[in-house]
Swiss-Prot record:
The keyword Chloroplast does not apply. This is Large ribosomal subunit protein bL34. It comes from the Bacteria. Keywords: Ribonucleoprotein, Ribosomal protein. One of its GO terms (biological process) is translation. Belongs to the bacterial ribosomal protein bL34 family. It comes from Francisella tularensis subsp. holarctica (strain LVS). GO terms for molecular function: structural constituent of ribosome.
Length: 44
């Protein structure tokens, strides 16, 4: 059976990367919340 997680760095960056997050309002909220929490990594 094929597993659901088929890693691809390109897909990873395009969907969860910093620039992808900055494109949408909700994505910017994610970055803002992660900054407020003090995360070392803001995006993938």
């Amino acid at each position: 059976m094929k597993r659901t997680f088929q890693p691809s760095n390109l897909k990873r960056k395009r969907t969860h990367g910093f620039r992808a997050r900055m494109k949408t309002l909700s994505g910017r909220k994610v970055i803002r919340n992660r900054r407020a929490k003090g995360r070392a990594k803001l995006a993938a």
